[in-house]
């Protein structure tokens, strides 16, 4: 191979509005203590009514492009992962975001893999770059999850937040600046564990019931058990496949869904506290945006430096899951 795919830059963005746990007490039978004990979440950010996922994503994307020492015209492909797209079916959020960046006549499409979206993005970008088809790929996890939440359901609405993370994937000749490995998987037999109901209305010729509200639905206990079991196996597999041990990893950056899930994986693999990046306490579950947001924060805090090896993992609706070993190739 003449070159490898490399994560050249990372940036994140969150809306300004902080929503603390106690604020849910206004309309739900819950409390700050109840939420934090079960999830590790203390607060999250919610976008305003005018903001869409693409608006959050474009801010992160502009910074990622700048940090890669590129301009929007240098981007060959844009791929967005989101479960809260700007439009129901079309156009894709990637197309909308591309236009806001001033990118024209370049391919753009969305990926639907829920909370595993960013791992899927890495897999797609790695394949395109290493095939030689594209040189610079912009990948964005952007979520306005607040737009798909039922605020009468305390089992879901307390968990999520809004935000975005973006990366530029380019080329390198150095293995230790590359996206070393990505593995993704899915099992649709559990699709009813975590889903957003169909919102298209039936025709007047055979209408029997009203269309479902487009709110996120989740079987929390079942998802928790499957997530822990699946992620433990998946992370062990990718480390073993690459002849690596937990101590070889500079940063473990899991999907920020629930502190208890993260802690179960961390303890099983014996990661030290300084290896683990946690943002769930202040941003909640931002779905496809959570991993790039956590990466972006680690970079801005000086914890992530060029050549550092990251282990990423995620689990989400589909059900989908995946993990990645990524050297940071930026500066």
Curated annotation (Swiss-Prot):
Disulfide bonds: none
Region ACP-binding, residue ranges: 256-260
Annotated active site: 115, 255, 285
A GO molecular-function annotation: 3-oxoacyl-[acyl-carrier-protein] synthase activity
GO cellular component: cytoplasm
EC number annotated for this UniProt entry: 2.3.1.180
Reactions it catalyzes: malonyl-[ACP] + acetyl-CoA + H(+) = 3-oxobutanoyl-[ACP] + CO2 + CoA
Assembly information from the UniProt record: Homodimer.
Name of the protein: Beta-ketoacyl-[acyl-carrier-protein] synthase III
Gene: fabH
């Amino acid at each position: 191979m003449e070159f490898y795919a490399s994560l050249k830059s990372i940036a994140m963005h969150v809306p300004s509005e902080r929503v603390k746990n106690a604020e849910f007490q206004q309309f739900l039978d819950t409390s700050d203590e109840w939420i934090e004990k079960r999830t590790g979440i203390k607060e999250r950010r919610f976008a305003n009514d005018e903001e869409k996922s693409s608006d959050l994503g474009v801010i992160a994307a502009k910074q990622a492009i700048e940090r890669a020492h590129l301009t929007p015209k240098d981007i060959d492909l844009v791929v967005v992962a989101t479960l809260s797209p700007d439009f129901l079916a079309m156009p894709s959020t990637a197309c909308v975001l591309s236009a806001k960046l001033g990118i024209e006549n370049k391919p753009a499409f969305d990926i639907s893999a829920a909370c595993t979206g960013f791992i899927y993005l890495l897999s797609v970008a790695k394949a395109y770059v290493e095939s030689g088809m594209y040189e610079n790929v912009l990948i964005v996890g952007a979520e306005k999850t607040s737009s798909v939440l039922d605020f009468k359901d305390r089992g879901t609405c307390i968990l999520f937040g809004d935000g975005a993370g973006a990366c530029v994937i380019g080329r390198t000749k150095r293995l230790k600046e590359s996206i070393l490995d990505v593995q993704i998987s899915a099992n649709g037999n559990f699709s009813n564990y975590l889903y957003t109901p169909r919102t298209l209305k039936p025709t007047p010729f055979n209408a029997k019931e009203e269309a479902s509200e487009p709110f996120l639905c989740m079987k929390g206990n079942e998802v928790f058990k499957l997530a822990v079991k699946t992620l433990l196996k998946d992370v062990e597999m990718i480390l073993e496949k690459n002849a690596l041990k937990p101590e070889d990893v500079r940063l473990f950056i899991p999907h920020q869904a629930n502190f208890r899930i993260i802690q179960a994986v961390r303890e099983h693999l014996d990661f030290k506290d300084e290896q683990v990046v946690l943002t769930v306490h202040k941003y909640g579950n931002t779905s496809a945006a959570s991993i790039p947001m956590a990466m972006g924060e680690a970079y801005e805090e000086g914890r992530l430096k060029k050549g550092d090896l990251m282990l990423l993992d995620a689990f989400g609706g589909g059900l989908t899951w995946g993990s990645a070993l990524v050297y940071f190739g930026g500066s």
